[in-house]
Amino acid sequence: MALSLTLQMTAFNKKMEESNPYFDYAFKWIDFATKYNSALLDASSKAFETFLSARKGTAQNIEKTIRSSFDTTLRDDLNDDALASSMADYVDSWAKLCDLFGYKQITANFYDFFSYANIILEPLRDNINRTPSEAIDTKGRFDLLHYKSDLPPEHKTPLLVVGSLINRYYILDLLPNVSIIKNLQRQGFDIYATDWGTPKSFDKDLTLETYAEEYVENAVEKVKEITGSDKVSLLGYCWGGLFALIYTSTHQENVKNLILHATPIDIDKEKTIIENWTAHLNADDLVDVFGNIPGWLINLTFLIRNPVEAMLKYPRYFSEPRSLDEITQFFAIETWLYDSRPIIGEVYRDIIDQVYRKNLLVKNKMIVGSDIINLKNITIPLLDIIGTKDDLVPPSASTSVINAVGSTDKKLIEFPTGHVGLCISNMAHEKLWPEVGKWLAQRS
């Protein structure tokens, strides 16, 4: 009897979902909320058990142990495929409901307004505490920045930094004392960088080929024209590393050295929460409804990985005296974290499908435009930089490139920090980036 009733209810729910998008949305929301709250409850329970058993040690160490227990349990639970699938179903039902109500155009108009407002703020945001630079006219919807220096470059080959499409480029030039740009500039490099700007709704049809082939090519050719160099070195950060890899595999004649910085290459090895959720998402529906992927959706995804830590980090940080420099750096990082730009729709669709779902890049089967990307074509010097504590791009997802390329001159640097720490930690600027600069100088 109970089994029969369960089957009847399942059939009823399925029928209602198919016939009514409201029910579909409601059921998917309830399912995801139930699984997500169960994960929070499980993590809280484990943290409480840790508290009961942590009788010795200082209050600070006990708190650290409890937080670690909560974080580890929550990450394990949130990385479960069933929860990831539930989240993807919920987002998909939400997208379909938005499409049904005609929110597509309303959303596009809202994000265009946001884009124009952001453009007004960009001169202020991009100049305070940044290394002086000038924007150079190029073909394409992006800016090529040339960082100014009072000293002439010591190395013949210029360096082009290829930024990510997810977050803003200025994490590499956050503050003078933790600026990768300034660090490498002091080591004698002539540095250029791509600023992809804030996309608008009519940019949604720009493709991966547009960025990885055309725009990077335009930037490379402009740098060559300005400097008189026949080649450039590329440094690709995160998804910018994907662009740099793709470009180098098809235009190696223009590239002297390739540096990859926290770049996802081999997703099958180990999936973080974000990578697992991303692989489960229906990118097609999201792009079809919204065009570009909203920046706030990206921010929300990062927040719900651990909402407790997100709330506690502020009172915990200010629980002890801080210098003005420390406070400035803290808020500079927070500003960058939530300054997520919308992701170009077609680029997102392509990367999610070919890299995160099918893992085609490392298999040499990824298609960009008319090209099949073969990493074995890359034979120039390559440096791969990873953070051993990176919870966005785990070490195993990046290290595979060492064996995937055809280069004989290649090096892996494993540094004990996280994704953002590679860019802004004092330890990285004292040890990591001088080592990167030394490696590059010997080949420039």
Where are these regions (language model features)?
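Short beta-strand/loop motif that positions the catalytic acidic residue
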Residues: I378, D384-I386, D390
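Catalytic histidine-centered segment of alpha/beta-hydrolase-like enzymes
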Residues: L392-P395, L412, P416-K431
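Alpha/beta-hydrolase active-site loop
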Residues: D205-I226
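Gly/Ala-rich beta-loop-alpha elbow adjacent to hydrolase catalytic centers
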Residues: L235-G240, A244
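Alpha/beta-hydrolase-fold enzymes
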Residues: A2-A95, D99, E225, S229, ...
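Low-complexity, highly charged intrinsically disordered N-terminal segments
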Residues: I62, I66-Y147, L175
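Short, surface-exposed "cap/lid" segments of acyl-processing enzymes
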Residues: I119-P123, N129-K200
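Short alpha-helix in the alpha/beta-hydrolase fold that links the catalytic acid
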Residues: I380, P394-N403
